[in-house]
Amino acid sequence: MADECSSIDRGRLRTGQWRKLRGLLLMLLEADGFYARKFRAAGLQPSSVNGVEDFIQKMPFTEKQELLADRLEHPPFGTHLTQPLTAYTRFCQTSGTSSGQPVAWLDTPESWEAMLACWRRVYEAADLVKGQDRIYFAFSFGPFLGFWTAYEAANGHYLTLPSGGLSSQARLEMMARYGATVLCCTPTYALRLGELIGPGSGVSLESLAVKKVIVAGEPGGSIPEVRSRIEALWNARVYDHHGMTEVGPVSYEATETPGRLTVIEEAYLAEVVDPETGVEVEDGQQGELVLTTLVRTAGPLLRYRTGDWVKKVMHAGRLTLEGGVLGRVDDMVVLRGVNIYPSAIEAVVRQFSDVEEFMVEQRKVDAMDEIELLIEVPGNVSKSLLKQIESKLRDTFSMRIPVRLAEPGSLPRHEFKAKRWRKV
């Protein structure tokens, strides 16, 4: 969509961000116990903040552990609420994959609608046509924000096809029967579902009308090897997107900028910082994404450390994330001086189409971290594949990473947020 990638006046954007932020700060001081305490602890008077840059200098980061502690001290919803509890009508919770414990989030109708508007940007940037496209949502009926906001944002604009708890086979048949043109799911599930297309399922590629696959929930949609494999399986264009329960839908991929996520800066004040110093990195450098929510006012977050590792690239006046979300800051493992992220391992593995599933095991050997790659392959595949993968890993990371065959069907399959790295 042309206007999604057109150049914008960054000064005008900053003015709009400050207008929203100024009102937010004053509201939080009066109504939000969590942030009122945080302001006092930092010696910060919201009325004394003189603009976006001043806010960044004075406001400390918000950490996930602070939010967890607040929920534990004031169960079940904590004190991070800007409205009376009776004003909230929507409930979602995090998956708990990064914190070990799900965290509940509540929204008012106004806050919810603000997030739906962000999701509509995702659809518009992917050039979906209202009244024509049919979106198939391959998600179960769960408490996760991504499905509900994506589904409700599409309602009233596109024909929406929910799949609930259907099996993968039933989902493929439903997509073929009703002519779904867009698939919305995680990258892992797009691969898993796509690999069923063919004689075994009775659903051929020719019987499907899918032309676009919108993925979210985990890194993958912007990893070239994962992206190309999904596109080959579906004969469709992949569009990446990312967001999180704590803040909402954050970014979109436009048709004109494949492999790059554009942050919705009208809804978020975004920074990319060095996680050690907290200082903003230069254009073209990598760092941790930090977000301040500007429109989800029922439970806004100020300078929230997302833990997402990204590459900052300014494009046409907008902040974009080159390569999407590259990984998690807390998932990084340092092996022999080399920083390794799970997404980097996946980028290598996905170059080998015979690998059906994989898992990385991390263990201590003589007080040092070591990793090993487990792979599942069809029984008729030569074991020489292990040597090929080991060679590719060595070329990529300049170290030997052992590869071992796992028993067929022994590695977990995932529909939502695949976890392929475990400590043993």
Predicted regions and their residues:
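Nucleotide 5′-phosphate-binding alpha/beta core
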Residues: 1-125, 367-372, 380-396, 402-415, ...
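Active-site phosphate/ATP/adenylate-binding loop shared across adenylate-forming ligases
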Residues: 2-3, 64-234, 239, 247, ...
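Generic structural signal for residues in well-ordered beta-strands
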Residues: 160, 238, 270, 358-360, ...
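Conserved beta-strand termini and adjacent loop/short-helix elements that scaffold enzyme active sites
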Residues: 163, 241-243, 273, 363, ...
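AMP-binding/adenylate-forming catalytic core of the ANL superfamily
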Residues: 183, 290-399, 416
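Conserved AMP-binding/adenylate-forming
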Residues: 220-222, 226-316, 331
